[in-house]
Amino acid sequence: MDLWLKEGQISDAVMTYKIKETLVRKKTEYQDLAIVDTYALGRMLVLDGIVQTSIKDEYVYHEMITHIPLYTHPNPKKVLVVGGGDGGTIREILKHPSVEKAVLCEIDEEVVKECKKHLPEISNNALEDSRCEVFIGDGIKYVNEHKNEFDVVIIDSTDPFGAAEGLFGGSFYGKISECLTEDGIFVAQTETPFYLPEIVKRVYDDSKAVFPVTKLFMAAIPTYPSGYWSFTIGSKKHDPEKAPVPEVLPFETKYYTPRLHSASFVLPKFVENLIFANISE
């Protein structure tokens, strides 16, 4: 008998994956956690029934959420990641030679532990790097307790439900601004404009109310609903579209390129209409 994973993040649409093997499934203090091996996309991290990442395409998300803000900032030395227990974002951050310290703040220790065990190629030992500090705890509380400390804050969260819901609130972005240095930058994954336009619009508006420079950029991520995903970047000073990205990167990537950095900010008309005007049916 075939076993299928059915993901129902969108109420009127589902995605299904044929499972080869269930590697772990448990109830943690915060969520249901599973790691499954699928035929189509390899091993996947699944939280509360929603796919978070897969071995086959994880690099798209992790490269885009990292290199866009880190190349926008002229000298990022200290970076905070809220969420991101799989370690992929830390892996990409530590490719930048200017980075002296990267803090991973993950609320669920089981995510870190099980990803190290079953998805080791995602972190690629980055969490053991001397520049990385892993803090198990509430990201909102951590941000509130640190002022004028980080050059870049990356919200590498699950979807805006359950434990991650507070990470999408407008008041939280004000706290992030206080956590950042005077020319700091923040970025967050902000869902798909196809199925969740109201979230994309709300986060964009909330960021714009706090950060003078707020932009939306896009990436093609097959694992996620619609395959077309948005990220919102907020900056106190620096424009990500004018970032001085080197013509040749000093490290290897699979998705991000200097030309793609600029191109990712070119939005289709329906997304422009969404963020620059009222949502229409």
From Swiss-Prot:
Sites binding S-methyl-5'-thioadenosine sit at: Q31, E106, D138, G139
Q: Where is the PABS domain?
A: 2-236
Q: Name one GO molecular function term.
A: spermidine synthase activity
> InterPro entries, per this entry?
PABS, PABS_CS, SAM-dependent_MTases_sf, Spermi_synthase, Spermidine_synt_N, Spermidine_synt_N_sf
Subcellular location, principal = cytoplasm
Cellular component terms per the entry's GO annotation: cytosol
Q: Which GO terms describe its biological process?
A: spermidine biosynthetic process
What are the EC numbers?
2.5.1.16
Q: Which reaction equation describes what this protein catalyses? A: S-adenosyl 3-(methylsulfanyl)propylamine + putrescine = S-methyl-5'-thioadenosine + spermidine + H(+)
Keyword Hydrolase applies: no
Give the active-site positions: D156
Residues noted as binding spermidine in the record, renumbered to the chain = H62, D86, D156, S157, T158, D159
Question: What subcellular compartments does it reside in?
Answer: Cytoplasm
| Source taxon at top rank | Bacteria
Keywords from UniProt, A to Z, are: Cytoplasm, Polyamine biosynthesis, Spermidine biosynthesis, Transferase
Pathways per UniProt: Amine and polyamine biosynthesis; spermidine biosynthesis; spermidine from putrescine: step 1/1
What binding partners and quaternary form does the record give? Homodimer or homotetramer.
What family is this? Belongs to the spermidine/spermine synthase family.
Q: Which PANTHER family match?
A: SPERMIDINE SYNTHASE, SPERMIDINE/SPERMINE SYNTHASE
HAMAP family (UniProt xref): Spermidine_synth
Q: What does this protein do?
A: Catalyzes the irreversible transfer of a propylamine group from the amino donor S-adenosylmethioninamine (decarboxy-AdoMet) to putrescine (1,4-diaminobutane) to yield spermidine.
User: Which named protein is this?
Assistant: Polyamine aminopropyltransferase
Whichever gene encodes this chain, its name is: speE
